[in-house]
A protein has these predicted regions:
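Bacterial Sec-dependent N-terminal signal peptides
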Residues: 1-10
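Short Ser/Thr-interspersed hydrophobic loop/turn segments at strand-loop and sheet-helix junctions
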Residues: 702-706
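Proteolytic maturation boundary segments
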Residues: 9-44, 132-209, 213, 221, ...
Length: 847
């Protein structure tokens, strides 16, 4: 507990309980937490948590037999109804406590909902320790409470909570250094893990843990930014830098602050030295005002956008309630938490010394510090790396970490020189917003949303990566990154990004087969600045050779680091199914040519010469009349063209038949979790709303059958669906299966080998054309799809993407959905499954 701020007594009162959460205690002492969350219509997550678990063997046995489950085992009951394992199975231990979690229970089937509740009550009767039942999802809390009261009569009175914690903070006076070998080619992960004392239970429902987590995030941002700047200036390749904070709500042990950077093993010593000096300087001198204010602005943006304190799904609600029961953490609404994290009731000049006191209390070169080096087998050892860290810490740093003035300087940005007039205004059917056309032909889609203080934007220009001159096979995946490596309006790419960040603006470029986009989020007060930035990107770009060379070093590490992750394997399988496809999403660093930036500039020049062949989308908290004035002022300076280039033909023919590959695990930093079975299936399917709806229901069928097939194999899986409309209309399914952690599986189930999993997956995927689909499941899948669709329409990023697909590729993913859902039949779903079965397929087994 490091927070140095003294709070008034009224501030330390309870944060309250979110309106969607109902909590209480049954007559026998069992507590309950019921969350009404209809975001996943027809489904709910269930959990049972007890403060003192039985032995792992006994907990696992309970999944094999209970008093009211004599005809079939509990885990088989779940399997039959599509309730699969997570990576840890059904059960986990958190210190002395134990938690059962059952996700996506089909409560549309009342008998399944009742049986699941009865199962939890049966499990409760196995122990006298304090326990709680948690249910989150599409439920009626009052009816569920009545049912619990009735069932609880079969469970004897539980022991009263002792109120005492066995936790004791033990300070570590010297650091630990640990070295682990990984199978990557050249990636070294260097971590500093700092422990601190837990927050006392009586303060867990107060603002203090929220403010601590806020300061932790700020520390992470300051250190991450310094690492990126310092490594870049020294030429040390950096694939990524990560920060994590595990507070007292995350588990029973110490709080943990983790900083991890991914660099080249060849630079492990110099990277460790540099990292230590950065931490040492912060400990001694604290953060600077500019970087503190910048970090605060980034944090506010993260909160507003939902990246922090965002909307919770059922699993997150369950975790929140489990934490409240075990550790006393808050059950406050996201609005309350977001308000605390973004409050501006302390001036930066007053808060910075408090923040620096927090940093000083946290950082130490020896105490409560663990150094972890995850490196290839290349002769490095923990002792020498630990010594490098200690010596660098003691010496400190003589570097100047102050921000450049250009980080907030916008004077060099391109200023608008020509004005336009609004020519026409019509209703836009997909978003429900307004489509404006200006006198130079540029189109803008505007929609006011419930967002507060910010807006989403995306500038889409038609014409994809096939238009890059002399593009080589495997280069297209890098094209979108090239825009971020340009000098913009006299600012190098890093200063331009820092300028955006200091003004609360995010910006990311991307380029696909149909179009290129510049997208992000900005504060409403920065609308004019954003338009100047977009104009500067359009008008004043120069490739930065040093930035490209450094990017190439870092990207090689990133590719090595992510090798054989699910995303990497899926892109690999997609490439196998389309062997002649030139524009794969998979990155091959050996195919990245040194002249790509210059060739991309020709492509970007052609794109920005016809801004009227695209669409600017602005959705969020923007005043309509003010926006029109700003657009009339800015859009006249963008280039337009009367005639547009034709989209080039692209060959993406699917291979026929099925192929199977078996490879050994590695390289990569996935840590062994890549072991398993991966399957991809794809088929050409004409795009229309009827086929889209049938495809979504078909994937729900596949998901349920895979749960049944893999339950006795002790495996979990992820299913990803993909619908493409260009260059060819096709539908794809990717399945990634992995063994569960065995301690969370039923006693009579063991984690299977990849080859055992393969037989189960083949049983499902090889027979999808005849897959069963009951009337009850069919109706439930339709209702779930209807709800998902309605939820998606509330997601600004989804709506923007749907709009851009409509105007870039001519396909409508929204209009006619209700009619298609109403008319879809089981026969249509089976027909689409048959089409998938007759397409291309790949098995990729990693052992």
């Amino acid at each position: 507990m490091l927070l140095p701020i003294m709070m008034h007594s009224q501030v330390l009162s309870s944060l309250g309980v979110a309106k969607e959460i109902t909590k209480g205690t049954l007559p026998n002492g069992v507590e309950y937490f019921l969350v009404q969350n209809t975001s996943d219509k027809g489904f709910a997550d269930y959990a049972l948590v007890r403060t003192a678990s039985l032995s792992i063997e006994d907990e696992r046995k309970s999944l094999c037999g209970l008093p009211h489950f004599t005809d079939r085992k509990p885990w088989q009951f779940f399997s039959e109804h599509g309730v699969g394992y997570s990576s840890y199975g059904y059960y986990t231990e958190e210190g002395s406590a134990g938690v059962f979690r059952f996700s996506n229970v089909p409560v549309y089937n009342q008998s399944v909902a009742d049986s699941t509740l009865l199962m939890l009550v049966d499990m409760t009767a196995l122990s006298r320790s304090p326990q709680a039942v948690v249910v989150s999802g599409d439920i009626n809390p009052s009816k569920l409470k009545e049912r619990l009261n009735l069932l609880s009569m079969t469970v004897p009175q539980l022991d009263c909570p002792s109120g005492e914690s066995s936790y004791k903070w033990v300070q570590k006076d010297s650091k630990r250094s640990i070295l682990i070998n990984n199978p990557s080619s050249d990636v070294a992960a260097i971590s500093a893990i700092i422990s601190s004392a837990r927050t006392s239970r009586e303060l867990m429902d107060s603002p203090q843990p929220i403010v601590t987590s806020m300061y932790a995030e700020l520390v992470g941002k300051v250190i991450s930014d310094r690492v990126r700047r310092e490594f870049r200036s020294r030429g040390i390749p950096l694939a990524d830098v990560e920060f994590s904070y595990a507070g007292s709500d995350a588990g029973p042990s110490d709080e943990r602050y983790g900083f991890t950077l991914y660099t080249s093993a060849k630079y492990a010593n110099v990277a460790t030295d540099c990292f230590a000096r950065i931490l040492s300087d912060l400990d001694r001198n604290g953060a600077l005002m500019d970087e503190f204010v910048d970090a605060k602005a980034q944090l506010s943006g993260d909160v507003r956008s939902g990246r922090l304190a965002g909307r919770l799904d059922n699993a997150a609600y369950v975790d929140k309630c489990v934490s409240a029961f075990l550790y006393g953490s808050n059950l406050a609404s996201n609005e309350v938490i977001a308000g605390l994290m973004t409050a501006k009731n302390i001036a930066p000049e007053t808060e910075l010394p408090l923040f620096n006191s927090f940093i000083s209390a946290l950082l130490d070169g020896e105490k409560n510090l663990t150094l972890r080096f995850n490196v290839p087998d290349c002769g490095l050892d923990a002792e020498s790396l630990g010594t490098t860290f200690s010596e660098a810490w003691k010496e400190g740093s003589d570097r100047d970490y102050s921000y450049k003035k250009t980080f907030s300087d916008t004077l060099s940005l391109y200023a608008p020189k020509s004005k336009v007039k609004l020519r026409s205004e019509i209703k836009e059917p997909i978003s429900g917003g307004s489509l404006w056309t200006f006198s130079n032909g540029i189109r803008v889609l505007y929609k006011k949303t419930a967002a507060r203080g910010e807006f989403h934007y995306s500038l889409m220009l038609r014409g994809g990566v096939a238009s890059v001159p002399d593009i080589h096979s495997g280069e297209s995946a890098f094209v979108g990154d090239m825009l971020s490596l340009d000098n913009i309006a006299g600012l190098n790419p890093y200063d331009f990004k820092a300028m955006l960040s200091s003004n609360g603006i995010t910006m990311k470029g991307s380029a696909g087969i149909s179009d290129m986009r510049i997208s992000g989020i900005a504060p409403k007060s920065k609308l004019r600045l954003l338009l100047r930035c977009l104009l500067s990107v359009s008008e004043s770009r120069v490739p930065d050779r040093d930035a490209f060379n450094y990017y190439k070093q870092c990207e090689a590490l990133r590719i090595d680091m992510e090798s054989l992750s699910a995303r990497d394997v899926n892109s690999l399988m997609d490439s196998i199914m389309r062997p002649e496809y030139f524009f794969t999403e998979r990155k091959y660093i050996e195919r990245l040519e040194d002249d790509l930036p210059e060739r991309c500039e020709q492509y970007f020049d052609a794109q920005f010469a016809k801004v009227n062949d695209g669409l600017l989308v602005l959705m969020g908290d923007l005043d309509e009349e003010h926006l029109k004035k700003e657009l009339c002022r800015a859009l006249g300076s963008f280039h337009v063209m009367k005639r547009f280039a034709q989209r080039p033909a692209v060959n993406s023919r699917l291979a026929s038949g099925a192929v199977s590959y078996t490879v050994e695990s590695g390289p990569g930093l996935v840590g062994g979790s890549e072991i398993g079975v991966n399957v991809a299936m794809a088929a050409p399917v004409p795009y229309n709303m009827e086929n889209q709806v049938a495809f979504k229901i078909a994937t729900s069928c596949i998901r349920k059958e895979l749960v049944k097939a893999l339950s006795d194999k002790g495996a979990f899986f992820e299913l990803t669906e993909k619908l493409e409309v260009f260059p060819d209309e096709r539908m794809s399914v990717f399945v990634n299966c992995h063994p569960c952690i065995e301690s969370g599986l039923p006693a009579d189930v063991s984690a299977a080998t990849p080859l055992d999993m393969l037989s189960a997956v083949r049983k499902v995927m090889g027979n999808i054309a005849t897959m069963p689909l009951s009337k009850e499941d069919f109706n439930a899948f339709k209702e779930e799809l209807q709800n998902d669709f309605q939820e998606s329409l509330q997601d600004t990023e989804y709506v923007i993407d749907a709009v851009l697909i409509r105007y870039a590729e001519g396909k409508d993913f929204v209009t006619g959905f209700k009619e298609a859902l109403k008319s879809v039949t089981p026969e249509k779903v089976r027909s689409l499954l048959g089409t998938l079965a007759s397409g291309a397929s790949v098995e990729y087994i990693i052992i």
